[in-house]
Amino acid sequence: MTGGAQGIGKTIAEEFQKQGAIVCSIDKQPGVYFTGDLAQQDTLEKFAQKVITEYGHVDYLINNALPLMKGIDNCSYEEFNYALKVGVTAPFYLAKLFQPYFSEGAAIVNISSSRDRMSQPQTESYTVAKGGISALTHALAVSLAGRVRVNSISPGWIDTDFTEYTGADAVQQPVHRVGNPMDIANMVLFLCSEKAGFITGENICIDGGMTKQMIYHGDCGWRFDI
């Protein structure tokens, strides 16, 4: 998996380990199976080679690494492309590198974002990367049909510190709470299980209903400050 050193990725890794899985995580931060920059082709190749040399096969690939978030006003050409390399190119290339080694019943789960369908100002690099990985999901599902199931998850507001919010922060969510990493980890485990054997090419939004909630200025206490 990618991006397993902290946050959602760390929780996913821990939950797989509880199920007896051997987790090979790559992250820029130290303390994981492989430390390196996902934007570099040679890093991806070295990571894949290490995994295959040591274990010989891959059951699940979880693409979770966080792309850079910068907007049109301050994001450089290099930074924008860096975000795409981490968020889209790396997931594609790892799937390509591991393609000959996926086990029977293997699954890929890509972590996208609810920002793949909605936006805030000055978030272009992140939003485009997340939109890209959502599209990559259904493309890979068709290309790898019959061998590997491929799905994606689009989290909404997930507090990676497991903070329990109250008041407006919680109530604005239709489920009346902010999400936590277990909400995502549980779905990843399900999508990798035989229970999800008839699901591929899908994107599942886990956002407490926020993207389904219509918001208008002056309605239900909402206001837009100009």
Question: Would you name each region that the model predicts?
Answer:
Residues G71-L84, D169:
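Substrate-binding pocket helix/loop in short-chain dehydrogenase/reductase
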Residues P100, A141-G146, G197:
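Alpha-helical segment proximal to the catalytic Tyr-Lys
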Residues S152, A168-I199, I206-G208:
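C-terminal helical subdomain
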Residues T200-I226:
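Short C-terminal tail/terminal secondary-structure segment
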